[in-house]
Curated annotation (Swiss-Prot):
Organism: Shewanella loihica (strain ATCC BAA-1088 / PV-4)
Protein function: Catalyzes the thiamine diphosphate-dependent decarboxylation of 2-oxoglutarate and the subsequent addition of the resulting succinic semialdehyde-thiamine pyrophosphate anion to isochorismate to yield 2-succinyl-5-enolpyruvyl-6-hydroxy-3-cyclohexene-1-carboxylate (SEPHCHC).
GO molecular function, one term: thiamine pyrophosphate binding
Protein EC: 2.2.1.9
Keyword annotations from UniProtKB, A to Z: Magnesium, Manganese, Menaquinone biosynthesis, Metal-binding, Thiamine pyrophosphate, Transferase
Assembly and oligomerization: Homodimer.
The protein, known as: 2-succinyl-5-enolpyruvyl-6-hydroxy-3-cyclohexene-1-carboxylate synthase
Lineage: Bacteria, Pseudomonadati, Pseudomonadota, Gammaproteobacteria, Alteromonadales
Length: 567
């Protein structure tokens, strides 16, 4: 009877954990199969408040959870068994920590007596994620530990989470309960009204510090030639407020690819390429004041401009306290929601409209890109611009070359997509799985633009794509290797080819077929547009493989840069 009660108590603790997470605003739980996590899996299977997502590969599962958390703006739970299953989550946890996305890992574990003695599938799991996750270690379930102790520990750990949390859950066998004959009424009685409410046992107010300058400080700050820079911003931060702020101050708004404003007609979205133009760069160098929202800028030219300019006044606005400035500039950092800071009583700048010429220069580049990309030879930049110009949808842009092409050449459009990236650690792993999570939250129409090596990294996440209920278009830019290295100063072409680009000669048609996904291979823009139209109308995931020459993108980038420098 006592052995049977162990299994039932394991399940009870699992049920308490999943119920409390649901009350702490968790909407999704991602699970991989495994025995040691059975108490958590069985509890999740019975939990009607959480949407379940299952996948056989823990590495992809972690990135799926990352995408769900990005799209839902809420914590996402992940359940894994013991051993290397937990370790496979590491890349996603690193990305989540760097970008402050809340993931809650619930890892099943062996009890203490089975660690370090040769027991099967047993590794030291506490602190496996080092500094990249907050660590919570639960003992094996025990009637001597009151349930309210478990709930308060979860509440304090998860409430207002700004990054990953690892809850390690030790369980003794048996793991599979039988008749559920144990009566836990007395054990649960201290929980009182919690059993009949929908609120967490402990409710923690958000202790977020909010800071704002005085009216006098605002007046002093805007006295000069200023620029506003929009870094990485989420759609929910209301980045469009920066358009109004820029117009009020009379300062140019320079926008990063991840700002949600890269394609806005009132912003200077072509800033990366404008910094190649001598006249535009000289004008920007007249600025003495900068107001930065967010961080993690993509463009090296914009990063260099920000770090090399001699600023008299430098303010950065962040939603929470962190360091997002690799140049380590002297500045005032304000902790504030973007919208609240933009809506302060800003006076008009004494140097309003000092950089109006940038608007014309930005529009001239837009015309150049239309002529030399849209109306020129088929290539990667042409495909990226075509996708970005399709209006309202979710757009996940892969790392390496795709996101840089978007940053350099995205079109100015009246309606732009919601842009997502994984630019914390900027890895090329897990990109398809992340896009699947973003698409799955509300089954919203989503396009992923991904390079061929990135897709090879995450090939088995096509199984996740096959489960999509909404439109997910997977556009693979296949230039046969890591051809971003064509843009880097590798000293020898033989070294570049043999040690960096790693041409593979592979195509993705059979991979798509293996997972039952519709597939099109295209080599011209007419075929791409036809395939893309069909894919956007399809209620599920589909694959479009864009086949281009290895040097097409790098040669076009160099050619455009040469023209811009001479203009």
């Amino acid at each position: 009877m006592q052995i049977e009660k162990t299994a039932e108590l394991n399940l009870l603790w699992g049920s308490l954990i999943l119920e409390e997470l649901a009350r702490l605003e968790v909407q999704h739980v991602c699970m991989a199969p495994g025995s040691r996590s059975t108490p958590l899996t069985l509890a999740a299977a019975k939990q009607t408040k959480l949407k379940q997502h299952l996948h056989f590969d823990e590495r992809g599962l972690g990135f799926l959870a990352l995408g769900l958390a990005k799209a839902s703006r809420a914590p996402v739970a992940i359940i894994t068994t013991s051993g290397t299953a937990v370790a496979n989550l590491y890349p996603a946890i690193v990305e989540a920590w760097l970008t402050q996305v809340p993931l809650i890992v619930l890892s099943g574990d062996r009890p203490p007596e089975l660690l370090g003695c040769g027991a099967n599938q047993a590794i030291v799991q506490p602190a496996i994620f080092a500094d990249y996750a907050k660590q919570v270690n639960l003992p094996t379930p025990d009637m001597a530990i009151p349930p309210q102790a478990l709930l308060t520990l979860l509440d304090e750990s998860v409430a207002n989470a700004k990054g990953p949390i690892h809850v390690n859950c030790m369980y003794r066998e048996p793991l599979y309960p039988g008749s559920m004959s144990a009566d836990f009424t007395h054990y649960l009685s201290p929980l009182g009204n919690w059993q009949h409410s929908a609120l967490p046992y402990n409710q923690f107010a958000d202790a977020q510090l909010v800071s704002a300058p005085t009216s006098d400080a605002l007046a002093r700050f805007v006295h000069g030639k200023g620029v506003i820079i929009a870094g990485t911003l989420a759609p929910e931060q209301q980045p469009e407020q920066l358009i109004e702020l820029a117009q009020k101050l009379g300062w140019p708004l320079l926008t990063d690819a991840q700002s949600q404003l890269r394609q806005h007609g009132a912003a200077i979205g072509n800033i990366d390429q404008l910094l190649l133009q001598p006249k535009a760069k000289a004008l920007l160098q007249e600025a003495d004041t900068v107001l930065v929202f967010g961080g993690r800028l993509l463009s090296k030219r914009l990063i260099s401009y920000l770090s090399e300019q001699k600023w008299k006044r430098y303010w950065q606005v962040l939603p929470q306290q962190t360091r997002l400035d690799p140049s380590h500039s002297a500045k005032q950092v304000w902790i504030s929601p973007l919208a609240a800071f933009a809506q302060l009583p800003w006076p008009r700048s004494s140097e309003a409209n000092w950089a109006l010429q940038l608007i014309e220069a930005n529009e001239q580049l837009a015309t150049l890109f239309q002529q030399q990309i849209d109306d020129a030879e088929f290539g990667e930049a042409q495909v990226v611009r075509t996708i970005a110009g399709r209006g309202e949808q979710q757009l996940f842009i892969g790392n390496s070359l795709p996101v840089r092409l978007y940053d350099m050449y995205a079109p100015i459009t009246p309606i732009a997509p919601r842009v997502f990236t994984n630019r914390g650690a900027s890895g090329i792993d897990g990109l398809l799985a992340t896009a699947c999570g973003i698409a799955a939250h509300k089954a919203s129409s989503t396009t992923l633009v991904i390079g061929d090596l990135s897709q090879l990294h995450d090939l088995n996440s096509l199984a996740l794509a096959a489960k999509q209920q909404g439109t997910l278009v997977i556009v693979i830019l296949n230039n046969d290797g890591g051809n971003i290295f064509n843009l880097l100063p590798v000293p020898d072409e033989k070294l570049r080819s043999g040690y960096y680009r790693l041409a593979h000669g592979l195509e993705f048609g059979y991979g798509a077929a293996m997972f039952g996904l519709p597939y099109n291979r295209v080599e011209d823009i007419v075929s791409f547009n036809e395939a893309y139209d069909d894919a956007l109308a399809y209620p599920g995931a589909s694959v479009i493989e864009v086949c281009v020459a290895q040097d097409q993108a790098s040669e076009q980038i160099a050619r455009l840069a040469a023209w811009i420098k001479q203009s």
